[in-house]
Amino acid sequence: MRALAVLLLLSAAHPAVAQGFDTVISGGTIYDGTGAPGFRGWVALNGDRVAAVGSGEAPKAARTIDATGKAVAPGFINMLSWATESLMVDGRAMSDIKQGVTLEVLGEGWSMGPYTAEMKTVLARQQQDFRYAIDWTTLGQYLAKLEKAGISPNVASFVGATTVRIHEIGAGDVDPTPAQLQSMAKLVREAMNEGAMGVGSSLIYAPASYAETPELVVLANASAGCGGSYISHMRSEGAGIEAAVDELVRIARESGGPAEMYHMKLSGKDNWGKLPAVLKKVADARAEGLDIRGNMYVYPAGATGLDASMPTWVQAGGIDAWVARLKDPATRAKVIAEMRGKPVGWENLAQSAGDPSKVMFIGFRNEKLRPLIGKTLAEVMALRGTSAEDTIIDLVIEDGSRVDTVYFLMSDENVKATASLPWVTLGSDAEASAPEGLFLKSSTHPRAYGNVARFLGKYVRDEKVDTLEGAVRRLSGLPAERLKLADRGFLKPGMAADVVVFDPATIADRATFEKPQQYAVGVSHVWVNGVQVLADGTHTGAKPGRFVKGPGFGKCPA
């Protein structure tokens, strides 16, 4: 009787119930993204929308998908994606679609606009395996270009604090004048008006590290005034992490907007015990009424470059100036001395890893160096007969790049503890990849292929850090609320038809650090805007993804 009442209610609101839907997903356990317990039922799709959700007998449809024994959830949101370039060359986003990701959120400190003519020239020269014309200027133009070209997932972006800084004052270690800072804030507002989600920073890297807190407050205030949030790779995730959290909280307090920590982690064994202090600072800020959250990838290693193992002053002005300084014997000697000492005002991730065997190279620009992909710093030191510091410096010079590098930095215990926090969402901090073509020229971090699946399999199912309904909320409804998305993140009538069907009993990551380019398993079906992009685990080739606009779109005056 209850099922009949539900169906009749939905029929009144949605006439298509009586007439038949485009697609009905039936027999699965529905997790609607709110954190409510799942229930056995059906989800109906019409066009690009969820038309109805109910229990009991499923209504008629042009196509019915049997989801018996599986979970049906809103499409997952990747809160930290580096699919900026990978989507330019392969819009399928295979590694993420196969995990149920339907929205890639870009913009960790660096964004694909706004650019000056000089920035375009430099970026074109620095392109590696992925080559494309930079025929846009603003961030909104880039995102619109992706949609027009065809992409399988939806895409959104924060505007990069680093990007607007370079736009106005270059890559040097200088402070903006008041007029330049106002121009930077204007660029943030313009990006918000185009649809950016907020402003993002990445403060351990040059030239982002040159920005002082008041500068970041001004940019965060510009974002908050347009409804956006501030999101940050904080100034330290190691010895200085408590001060870094204090800075994030200060920026939230003074800007009046929400703030979020990228890839919440504690780097270096000496810092692993600081997690309780960090969580207390967040709890105190939240009790004060500040909206502080975080996101993470569920691995004990991070991936970045060798720039994160050198003092930031030597990197001022960009890669060409950096390499030129390293070639100067006196400067090189000074850099080596600082790399061997205790870092002051910067993070040395090679030092934090604790041993050269815990630093692995995964990507080079120089073809001659590519045989070193997959080798550790210790192995390359042995091959060359050089010290850790000399090896790092030589590789940067020879490659003319920061060199893509994995650092084993975190404890499994802290990863598990952080993965249990109800205010922490998931972000891969990686490209959307495929084990084919250009992607095979380099390696990657396994998080590119397994972050969501590892969370749902290893951590939720096996280690029970959260309920399944709580985990789905943190992959869908919670990030959608943070981004102020009015029509995504939940399985409710009228919402965008971004849907994933997966098997909670079998979902798992297969990618490892030794063999990272392996797809996850357990996701059978994915829809993006009502179009099926994954059917029985196979990509359909469809590219219905859209540029998802942020809260200031069209209403944020510059």
In which residue ranges do the predicted regions lie?
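C-terminal cap of metal-dependent C-N hydrolases
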Residues: 28, 328, 417-423, 429, ...
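Acidic, glycine-enriched loop/beta-strand segments at the rims
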Residues: 30-42, 403-409, 414-415, 463-473, ...
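Metal-associated gating/positioning segment near the N- to mid-region
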Residues: 67-137
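Bacterial N-terminal signal peptides
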Residues: 3-13
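Active-site neighborhoods of metal-dependent hydrolases
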Residues: 142-146, 151-178, 182-205, 216, ...
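Sec/Tat signal peptide C-region and signal peptidase I cleavage site
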Residues: 14-18
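Histidine-rich, glycine-flanked metal-binding segment
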Residues: 20-23, 30, 34-75, 90, ...
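Divalent metal-binding pocket/active-site signature
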Residues: 190, 196-247
